Amino acid sequence: MASSSRAFFKVFNPAPKSIPRIGQSNLMQLTHKKQLPTFQRRGIAEDSLLPSSTTPIKPMNVETKHTRTMGDIFVQHCQKLELFRNVLRNVAELDALEGLNMIDAVQRLGIDFHFQREIDEILHKQMSNVSASDDLHEVALRFRLLRQHGYFVPEDVFNNFKDSKGTFKQVLGEDIKGLMSLYEASQLGTEGEDTLVEAEKFSGHLLKTSLSHLDHHHARIVGNTLRNPHHKSLASFMARNFFVTTQATNSWLNLLKDVAKTDFNMVRSLHQNEIVQISKWWKELGLAKELKFARDQPQKWYIWSMACLTDPKLSEERVELTKPISFVYLIDDIFDVYGTLDDLILFTEAVNRWEITAIDHLPDYMKICFKALYDMTNEISCKVYQKHGWNPLQSLKISWASLCNAFLVEAKWFASGQLPKSKEYLKNGIVSSGVNVVLVHMFFILGQNITTKSVELLNETPAMISSSAAILRLWDDLGSAKDENQDGNDGSYVRCYLEEHEGCSIEEAREKTINMISDEWKKLNRELLSPNPFPATITLASLNLARMIPLMYSYDGNQCLPSLKEYMKLMLYETVSM
């Protein structure tokens, strides 16, 4: 059995009998957007629809037609993993395109961590054939998979599909499969790649046009590609759709689906156990009782960790990462809900000093929060030092100080009733989003490739962090700007932009914001390409954070989050039928 399989099951334990339970009513009551003050910071810590620590979680019970022990499931699952691993190697050796299709399927099901070595080997060989085909699907699929894996493939591989005028050939409109692959590939574009911009417009237009004459099944597949391109979506969320829409035409796909179903159920149980650990830590910390104004939603905080760190082997890391995320929410509540401006200034000064004696002049509730933050940060630093031989305390302190400084800037804006310039707002909003705090802690908790150079770069907020943070800030601001009848200054980028561009409509401001999100994605895509000073795990986590954002901030007309509700139901509530 492969080592990756053993490592996966090393962290898997059946859910305890006393595990809490999520009910449908609990999910329903958490779908409304929080009413915000007129100038409200929005970021990681904005309220959404996840439950409180008292919300129970239904225990997972893996069942088939015949009752089997977990040991039986483990053995059979590992056998199937090894079988598919051999099939993947053999098929890719004989048929390059089919090998690419297999990798694509593995990634869409979100279980590529099992086959990383095989994928590495196959894609490395594929670099010599980047444009050796006149099939649009094959060229586009190879381009996307290689770029996702860090290989720089030039955009001119698509020149063979252009006419003498330099535009994509209209005859490609008959190749729906190729157009979908081209659209997917265009999502990997970086700044200045005009061919990929054209590819997205060309393929997107023809695919939308095709919806009217395709049968229901194929129209559903095309529509899903347009709404949820793979590169910008969470595989764990879209995998269920892959099961429904993909019809098996060969034996390897049936085998892969079987492997994925078992994986989903086991990972679901693992996530439930992690939530139990987080809930226990939060309860023992006692802040929910001490600070009545603060949110009490450990499951909500955990969802970020679950989305960012998808490899089951990273169970301990997900639990540890949720702890600083909880303090982002807690401190956000202090700045938003409870603190006076004078108290917030004192609290920010205390965090910048990072001395326990700094709490002497704070009100009691701030003393409690600062002491808990101080202890939690020192505890994480000790764990990182013991496990990885590096003391991250200085970097962690910098991240908390930066967050509080940004929160304070926005508190002063709110107190003055004045809107800042849009650029100033976004620059500060990137920090106050909380993304920097989360990814800095994640880097050290993962403990991979910690060097003086990488730490110095991390402390300077690299593009990997700033782009993810900007995407979060702008996505959230799009949601807050939907209501043109809002009173006052809601502090969104859209409102700031409207304020300084007289005559600009809200539709134009929203279009500007959407284009900025696209530009930030291009910057983030550049960070995926080699050489990258950060390990692949942290880069993927940053990417997954950006993928999670639409689920967290896509409000419907009732100011609800249906996509996030569905994600939570799939990941923690529903089993996959065996």
Curated annotation (Swiss-Prot):
GO cellular component: chloroplast; mitochondrion
Tissue distribution of the protein: Not detected in leaves or green fruit.
EC id: 4.2.3.48
Pathway given in the UniProt record: Secondary metabolite biosynthesis; terpenoid biosynthesis
Binding site for Mg(2+) 2: 332, 336
CDD domains per record: Terpene_cyclase_plant_C1
Transit peptide location: 1-29
UniProt xrefs under InterPro entries: Isoprenoid_synthase_dom_sf, Terpene_cyclase-like_1_C, Terpene_cyclase_plant_C1, Terpene_synth_N, Terpene_synth_N_sf, Terpene_synthase-like, Terpene_synthase_metal-bd, Terpenoid_cyclase/PrenylTrfase
Keyword Endoplasmic reticulum attributed: no
Stated family: Belongs to the terpene synthase family. Tpsg subfamily.
The name this protein goes by in its record: (3S,6E)-nerolidol synthase 2, chloroplastic/mitochondrial
